[in-house]
C-alpha cells in the first residue's frame, strides 16, 4: 500500500489551465473518487499520478517520495482505462501476463500469478479465450486483472464502467468494492457518475473547472455541500432550488420569504447573510413532504409523473416563479398531470445558499455523517 500526496499541483497546456493548485492527501488503502462534469480535470489528475502527463507546477509524492520526474514504470502504480486496452490477438491469460513477461518474470511465477488473479475475478474458465469472445463485463475484469497481476501499490481507474450497460455497471461496481476490501490497496477512481462516487468512495473529491470544490465522505457531501455546485452535482434527482429573500437573521437561524410570501426560519448559520438579500433555498426531492404533515407548503401544477415502481417522481411547476421542483416518494403516488399539487417544506431539511453560491452551514445533524 502507498499514500499519495498532491501539493499545489497544477497542469496547464500553454495558457490553458486544466488543474489549479490541487492539494490532497490520500492515505494508504483509501478509496478516493474524483467526480465532476466533463472537462473539470479529473482524468488529467489521474494521468499526472500515473506519470502519463507532466506536472506543470507543484509536488506529486507517492509514499512521501517526489515523483514528478520518475518514469511511470517505476512509480508502483497500475492503471485501468475506460477502453479496456486489451490486445485482440492475445488470449485472456496472455493479456493478463503481458506486463510480467515484459519485465522478464519467471514462467512459473507468471502462471501462478495469473491463475491466482483469474480465480479471484472469476475468469479461470476464460483464460484461453480472446477478447472478442467476452462480454463487456468480462473484458473489464480482464483489464482489472492485468493490473492486479503487476501487483501495484496504487490502483488508478479511469471511468472503467462507462462503456457498460446499466445492469453490468451495478455488478462491476459491487465487484470493485469487494476487490478493494479484499486487497486493502490504495485506489483512485475517476467518474462523472455521482452514484458510483457515492457507493464506492471512502472520500469524494468534487472538481469544478479545474478547482477542488469539496473533499469529504459521501454523506458529508450529500447533506452538507459547501456550495450550490456541489449540492446540484451530488444527488439524483438533483437538489431543488428556489429563489427566496432574507427577511431577518439571528445567530443560528435565518428567516426567508418563499415565492408564495410565507415566511419560515431555517436552522442555519447567518454569517455572511444580510436582510433583504436574494438567496437560494435548496431541498432534496426526497425531503419534500406530503402537505398534510407539513406546516409550510407550496402549491404547484403537476407537469410530469414518473412511476418507477419502487418510487414516484412528480415534477411540479411553481406558477409564481415558473420553476419546476421534483417531489420524490418511495411509493406509488397517484396524481394526474395538470392537477394542482401541494408539497411541504420541512425547515430542518432545507439548505440556504448565499448570493455568491456558498452554503450557510446547516445546524441540523444528519444520521451517518
Swiss-Prot record:
Domain ABC transporter: 4-234
EC number: 7.5.2.1
Gene3D superfamilies: 2.40.50.100, Nucleic acid-binding proteins, P-loop containing nucleotide triphosphate hydrolases
Family matches, as InterPro entries: AAA+_ATPase, ABC_transporter-like_ATP-bd, ABC_transporter-like_CS, ABC_transpr_MalK-like, ABC_transpr_MalK/UgpC-like, Mo/tungstate-bd_C_term_dom, NA-bd_OB-fold, OB_MalK-like
A GO cellular component entry from the record: maltose transport complex
Enzyme class: translocase
The keyword Thylakoid appears for this protein: no
Keywords, in A-Z order: ATP-binding, Cell inner membrane, Cell membrane, Membrane, Nucleotide-binding, Sugar transport, Translocase, Transport
Membrane topology, from the record: Peripheral membrane protein
Highest taxon of source: Bacteria
Main location: membrane
Keyword Transmembrane applies: no
Reactions that this protein is recorded to catalyse: D-maltose(out) + ATP + H2O = D-maltose(in) + ADP + phosphate + H(+)
Localization annotation: Cell inner membrane
Gene Ontology MF terms: ABC-type maltose transporter activity; ATP binding; ATP hydrolysis activity
SMART domains named in the record: AAA
Family: Belongs to the ABC transporter superfamily. Maltooligosaccharide importer (TC 3.A.1.1.1) family.
PANTHER family per UniProt: MALTODEXTRIN IMPORT ATP-BINDING PROTEIN MSMX, MALTOSE_MALTODEXTRIN IMPORT ATP-BINDING PROTEIN MALK
Subunit description: The complex is composed of two ATP-binding proteins (MalK), two transmembrane proteins (MalG and MalK) and a solute-binding protein (MalE).
Role: Part of the ABC transporter complex MalEFGK involved in maltose/maltodextrin import. Responsible for energy coupling to the transport system.
Protein name (database record): Maltose/maltodextrin import ATP-binding protein MalK
Organism per entry: Photorhabdus laumondii subsp. laumondii (strain DSM 15139 / CIP 105565 / TT01) (Photorhabdus luminescens subsp. laumondii)
Name of encoding gene: malK
Amino acid at each position: 500500500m502507498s499514500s499519495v500526496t498532491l501539493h499545489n499541483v497544477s497542469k496547464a497546456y500553454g495558457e490553458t489551465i486544466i488543474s489549479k493548485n490541487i492539494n490532497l492527501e490520500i492515505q494508504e488503502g483509501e478509496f478516493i473518487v474524483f467526480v465532476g462534469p466533463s472537462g473539470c480535470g479529473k482524468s488529467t489528475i489521474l494521468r499526472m499520478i500515473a506519470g502519463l502527463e507532466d506536472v506543470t507546477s507543484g509536488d506529486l509524492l507517492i509514499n512521501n517520495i517526489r515523483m514528478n520526474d520518475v518514469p511511470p514504470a517505476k512509480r508502483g502504480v497500475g492503471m485501468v482505462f475506460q477502453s479496456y486496452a486489451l490486445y485482440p490477438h492475445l488470449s485472456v491469460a496472455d493479456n493478463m501476463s503481458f506486463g510480467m513477461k515484459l519485465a522478464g518474470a519467471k514462467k512459473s511465477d507468471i502462471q501462478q500469478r495469473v491463475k491466482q488473479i483469474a480465480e479471484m475475478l472469476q475468469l479461470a474458465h476464460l483464460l484461453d479465450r480472446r477478447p472478442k469472445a467476452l462480454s463487456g463485463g468480462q473484458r473489464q475484469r480482464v483489464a482489472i486483472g492485468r493490473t492486479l497481476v503487476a501487483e501495484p501499490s496504487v490502483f488508478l481507474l479511469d471511468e472503467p464502467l462507462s462503456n457498460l450497460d446499466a445492469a453490468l455497471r451495478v455488478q462491476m461496481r459491487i465487484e470493485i468494492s469487494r476487490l478493494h476490501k479484499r486487497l486493502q490497496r490504495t485506489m483512485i477512481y475517476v467518474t462523472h457518475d455521482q452514484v458510483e462516487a457515492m457507493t464506492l468512495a471512502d472520500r469524494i473529491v468534487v472538481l469544478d473547472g479545474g478547482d477542488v470544490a469539496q473533499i469529504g465522505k459521501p454523506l458529508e457531501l450529500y447533506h452538507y455541500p459547501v456550495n450550490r455546485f456541489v449540492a446540484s452535482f451530488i444527488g439524483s434527482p438533483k437538489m431543488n432550488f428556489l429563489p427566496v429573500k432574507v427577511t431577518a437573521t439571528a445567530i443560528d437561524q435565518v428567516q426567508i420569504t418563499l415565492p408564495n410570501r410565507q415566511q419560515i426560519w431555517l436552522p442555519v448559520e447567518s454569517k455572511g447573510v444580510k436582510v433583504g438579500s436574494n438567496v437560494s433555498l435548496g431541498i432534496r426531492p426526497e425531503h419534500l413532504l406530503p402537505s398534510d404533515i407539513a406546516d409550510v407548503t407550496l402549491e404547484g401544477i403537476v407537469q410530469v409523473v414518473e412511476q418507477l415502481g419502487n418510487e414516484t417522481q412528480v415534477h411540479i411547476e411553481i406558477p409564481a416563479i415558473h420553476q419546476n421542483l421534483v417531489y420524490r416518494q418511495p411509493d406509488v403516488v397517484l396524481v394526474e398531470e395538470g392537477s394542482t399539487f401541494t408539497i411541504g417544506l420541512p425547515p430542518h431539511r432545507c439548505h440556504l445558499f448565499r448570493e455568491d453560491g456558498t452554503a450557510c452551514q446547516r445546524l441540523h445533524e444528519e444520521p451517518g455523517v
